Amino acid sequence: MSELLSVALFLASVLIYAWKAGRNTWWFAATLTVLGLFVILNITLYASDYFTGDGINDAVLYTLTNSLTGAGVGKYILPGIGIALALVAVFGALGWILRRRRHHPHHVGYSLLALLLALGSVDASPAFRQITELVKSQMRDGDPDFAVYYKEPAKTIPNPKLNLVYIYGESLERTYFDNDAFPNLTPELGALKNEGLDFSHTMQLPGTDYTIAGMVASQCGIPLFAPFEGNASASVSSFFPQNICLGDILKNSGYQNYFVQGANLRFAGKDVFLKSHGFDHLYGAEELKTVVADPSYRNDWGFYDDTVLDEAWKKFEALSRSGQRFSLFTLTVDTHHPDGFISRTCNRKRYDYDGKPNQSFSAVSCSQENIAEFINKIKASPWFKDTVIVVSSDHLAMNNTAWKYLNKQDRNNLFFILRGDKPQQETLAVKRNTMDNGATVLDILGGDNFIGLGRSSLSGQSLSEVFLNVKEKVLAMKPDIIRLWNFPKEIKAFTIDRDKNTIAFSGSHFRLPLLLRVSDKRVEPLPESEYSAPLRFQLADFAPRDNFVWIDRCYKMAQLWAPALALSTDWCVSQGQLGGQQTVQHVDKAQWQGKTAFKDTMIDMERYKGNVDTLKIVDNDIRYKADSFIFNVAGAPEEVKQFSGISRPESWGRWSNAQLGDEVKIEYKAPLPKKFDLVITAKAFGDNANRPIPVRVGNEEQTLVLGHDVSTITLHFNNPTDANTLVIAPPAPVSTNEGNILGHSPRKLGIGMVEIKVVNVEG
């Protein structure tokens, strides 16, 4: 209703101003600004909803602002461009409509009415309400009920007898198992669900609605609320360090805890969370690539579910044979939005809905088949009698191609349990939430029936039953939950460990690189990973007086304040204010001690603007002074005009990438010498090794032969035509996820370049 009201008020404001208000610059600007805010809010809501399926929520703050955890990046480029174009078009149309009758005399009454209606449209919009609620949740002091309901369990299980297999199905919510709504979509796993304890009303709460948040909620009994924005959990060295979670209890009780997934463990800080809470054996994309049968069989996120669950079965079998007590957690990925992925071994590769194939439903049908096969192997084994199997969704499905059909149903998370020691078939309709999962499992294993805010659904009462407004209650507890991090509020002295690539201050440790925004009562960490904006772009958003400490590779800050370090890949520390003074210090010791020193200087807005503009220069436009092209730093030598076909810098250099251009092209500002040596330090990828690689300058072509290891080759060129472009054409670019960023489409690699140098031998 509020959505319709806000649209009606918006249209009324536009019509009244366009036809009755007349000409007045101030009223026009004010009305256009408010109407434009309405448009921006709703486009933000649409964009957020596209990722989360739940509008503007904590998942947006935690993930989308910096990390794009919601999707393979390539699949969102077109929607992003579409949103930007729509924004420009709507603003242009608004301005044109509002000025349609600009030659008519101004009428204050109608102008005021139009402005009030515009303000009303903003206030009534769901986007404004959601943002307001998020802001309120950030500013609350806490809720007195938190101390009443937050309970810390005993650290051990008195007499543990059962092993645990816990399967997180990516976005695999219980709604998919409604056979009336989606006939024969989940027959294999649905049949298993009906054999066990099936909890049919597991609701989703704020702070539990994306993968790492769902894992934290299900193991620690609390939502994932943090004292920082973005994906900073990937940079911290510990995760809710004061909490006792399910993994801690299992480890203290003699369990060996294992976690297996197909994606990179660093993604969203899963490795930090698991290591902080009892898991000593972690297997992700990097760990599995040396043991799986086919390392090239991957999707955009990592290994397919059939591969991951095969490895999980091998772990289960080996651990069971060893006789040691263990837990085995695994996380699937094939059902990740927006489309999902189809494993090649499943029989169910296609599911039609409304008379046409639907990729998301197809991925669900395939993945559930793989999960069911894994479970049936366990059930058929002699070790099932000593095992508890848990199957749950990590969160409700986000905006995938099945989402509009899911939204027509009563949506709940999946959570069911199969007990090998005590088979029990029952559907339990008790109201519960994801925070209750860990407590329910702990209860079955013989421990307490509570963890944090979670309660066992077999012997306790969930917060979802206690509070009718449980979502609002959880948001009110957000400050209390944030305090559990015990996060430092100041930084005076700090230590950088050059070997471990970490910084320590006030008892906390973070991975490098890192940007800190420092105020009187708060230190906000802003990390950089493959999934977030580069730190210099994040720093460019700081206000002129914001104090910062920036620890990064020297060359990244050299173009601003330390040109002598333009080619250094060592660590440097910069601190100051963008509108004031900045310092840069080279980290030249293994254990480097530093202190913060923020001077209260006069702010220079011209300096601020210059710093921001320089920080925002894209990598390929950066130029440095050097007599060669150094590929492990961003940019190119000053002599280079432009280049293409080259991927991002890595620690050793850069790959050619045929996705960015069929050939490597380096265009220099001036003609290359009449006679020169081209010294190339490089290596080849895949089938490009030990094959002739054409290298052209003007009309002259030579060949380069490289192996898989880095070597240096010198080619002798004549350049009578004064050509200024160097072209290298790898003969067989290979599509691969080697060294790729999680969620990005595969690159097509040819050669890996470390350095290219032009040596003038003319005369």
Curated annotation (Swiss-Prot):
Domain of life: Bacteria
Keyword Kinase: no
CDD domains, per the entry: LTA_synthase (cd16015)
UniProt keyword annotations, A-Z: Cell inner membrane, Cell membrane, Membrane, Transferase, Transmembrane, Transmembrane helix
Transmembrane segments: 1-21, 26-46, 77-97, 108-128
Membrane topology, from the record: Multi-pass membrane protein
EC number assigned by the record: 2.7.8.20
Catalysed reactions listed for this entry: a phosphatidylglycerol + a membrane-derived-oligosaccharide D-glucose = a 1,2-diacyl-sn-glycerol + a membrane-derived-oligosaccharide 6-(glycerophospho)-D-glucose
MF-aspect GO terms: phosphatidylglycerol-membrane-oligosaccharide glycerophosphotransferase activity
Cellular compartments per GO CC: plasma membrane
Membrane is among the record's keywords: yes
SUPFAM superfamilies: Alkaline phosphatase-like (SSF53649)
Subcellular location as annotated: Cell inner membrane
This protein's pathway: Glycan metabolism; osmoregulated periplasmic glucan (OPG) biosynthesis
Coarse class of the protein's main subcellular location: membrane
HAMAP family cross-referenced by the UniProt entry: MdoB_OpgB
PANTHER family xref list: LIPOTEICHOIC ACID SYNTHASE, PHOSPHOGLYCEROL TRANSFERASE I
Family according to the record: Belongs to the OpgB family.
Function noted in UniProt: Transfers a phosphoglycerol residue from phosphatidylglycerol to the membrane-bound nascent glucan backbones.
Name of the featured protein: Phosphoglycerol transferase I
Native organism taxonomy: Bacteria, Pseudomonadati, Pseudomonadota, Gammaproteobacteria, Enterobacterales
UniProt gene name: mdoB
